[in-house]
């Protein structure tokens, strides 16, 4: 390698589903590097053998790619054996094209790590990783529930049962009771009045007309399974939420600080989602800009030959950004927080809604970083600081007259005639 060697003893791992290719690079005082290669199984026994092999060569620095979920058990075993693991995105350790093998990939990762050319990924503590896994699984359950509700809605639409026209929520108490009655007695006409709650604003006559449809046997079977699956998913989601609240109890003080930010005090799970993604220790992000960049809420740098190819935000934070956007969309509609609404309107007028919303997300992330760094509650003063006023500008008489002309003003002398200014800085036509 022609680059400067920063680590004299390190290891590169090429992790696969069944096998792990390892390569240790040992550099002596004369800058000569000797490589040791080995192949290990991804079973627990093979991971323990990997730890023993690393200790044999006194290697405590390991670098590997984040390949799917296969890196997680390897990381856990190495971390328990006091081995420092650097996890990197595959795009930062991409090998040269041609003549590629797994052993050469491990050696390439070792060489990059040896020369300090690997960009490490953010790995939160173990308890935060467990919390993140449950929070993301809850999000998947929510998506599954939404999908099943759409299928149930389609069954009612195909059968010409217009419950969505008379109820705001077809899965509410009254609508669900009517749906169950239809499934128990398909094709029969019944009175809907006993199933409608007294607080329902829709007249009984309209509801009776909305259920004047016929559901087929096939659609009834499908609708029954959809409703049953929705109930099961809701039960699983409630159990996951109980476990999420249990795991987040030790971070209650941090969550209270996050909930002082506008938009995070309505739903207690919103603050937990933020905690599960970024953790409670902000020392891993030197500045608020680093956190914003990690979350994918800032423009990219993609420039070549003085041409800017793209300034779009990155695809990072696929689970984190939707939460921030949801909070930002709620904040811009509130009149209680002018620090957000004023900035949103100013940017929207120039750049549009989408870019303005991402700017509000950046403001929220900046506030989160400062709150968790200083351990102080949110205050809007930081965003409401007055901008520095420009110094007095000096204009010549012709410049001042030209400016007044552009604004459409008419200059009238106190004693002289009236001058109309339209085409030039100095008056020509006087009357």
Label the predicted regions:
Residues 117-119, 148, 185-188, 237-241, ...:
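Short helix-capping/linker segments at secondary-structure and domain boundaries
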Residues 422-431:
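Single conserved hydrophobic/aromatic residue that forms the stacking wall/gate
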Residues 348-403:
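Basic, amphipathic alpha-helical segments enriched in Lys/Arg and hydrophobic/aromatic residues
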Residues 208-269:
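Helix-hairpin-helix/helix-loop-helix acidic hairpins
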Residues 119-136, 163-166, 218-221, 305-313, ...:
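Short, solvent-exposed helix-loop connector elements
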Residues 97, 256-260, 272-354:
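Phosphate-backbone recognition surface of nucleic-acid-processing proteins
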């Amino acid at each position: 390698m022609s680059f400067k060697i920063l680590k004299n003893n390190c290891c590169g791992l090429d992790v696969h589903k069944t096998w792990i290719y390892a390569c240790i690079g040992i550099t002596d005082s004369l800058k000569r590097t000797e490589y040791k290669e080995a192949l290990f199984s991804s079973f627990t026994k093979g991971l323990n053998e990997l730890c023993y092999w690393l200790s044999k060569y006194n290697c405590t620095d390991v670098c590997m790619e984040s390949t799917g979920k296969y890196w997680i058990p390897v990381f856990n075993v190495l971390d328990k054996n006091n081995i420092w693991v650097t996890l990197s995105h595959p795009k930062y350790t991409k090998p040269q094209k041609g003549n590629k093998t797994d052993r050469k990939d491990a050696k390439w990762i070792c060489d990059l790590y040896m020369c300090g050319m690997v960009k490490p990924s953010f790995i939160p503590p173990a308890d935060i990783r467990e919390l993140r896994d449950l929070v993301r699984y809850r999000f998947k359950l929510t998506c599954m529930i939404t999908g099943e509700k759409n299928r149930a809605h389609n069954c009612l639409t195909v059968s010409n049962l217009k419950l969505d026209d008379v109820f705001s929520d077809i899965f509410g108490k009254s609508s669900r009771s009517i749906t169950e009655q239809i499934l128990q007695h398909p094709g029969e006409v019944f009175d809907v009045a006993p199933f409608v709650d007294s607080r329902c604003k829709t007249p009984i006559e309209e509801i009776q007309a909305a259920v004047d449809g016929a559901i087929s046997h096939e659609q009834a079977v499908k609708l029954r399974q959809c409703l049953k699956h929705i109930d099961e998913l809701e039960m699983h989601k409630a159990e996951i939420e109980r476990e999420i609240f249990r795991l987040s109890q030790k971070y209650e003080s941090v969550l209270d600080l996050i909930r002082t930010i506008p938009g995070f005090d309505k739903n207690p799970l919103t603050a937990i989602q933020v905690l599960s993604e970024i953790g409670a220790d902000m020392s891993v992000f030197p500045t608020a800009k680093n956190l914003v960049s990690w979350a994918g809420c800032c423009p990219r740098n993609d420039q070549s030959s003085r041409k800017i190819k793209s300034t779009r935000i990155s695809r990072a934070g696929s689970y984190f950004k939707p939460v921030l956007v949801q909070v930002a969309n709620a904040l811009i509609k509130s009149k209680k927080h002018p620090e957000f609404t004023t900035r949103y309107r100013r940017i929207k007028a120039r750049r549009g809604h989408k870019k303005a919303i991402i700017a509000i997300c950046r403001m929220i992330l900046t506030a989160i970083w400062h709150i968790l760094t200083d351990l102080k509650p949110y205050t809007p003063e930081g965003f409401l600081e007055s901008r520095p006023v420009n110094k007095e500008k000096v204009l010549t008489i012709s410049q001042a007259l030209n400016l007044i002309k552009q604004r459409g003003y008419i200059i009238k002398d106190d004693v002289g005639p009236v001058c109309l200014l339209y085409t030039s800085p100095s008056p020509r036509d006087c009357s």
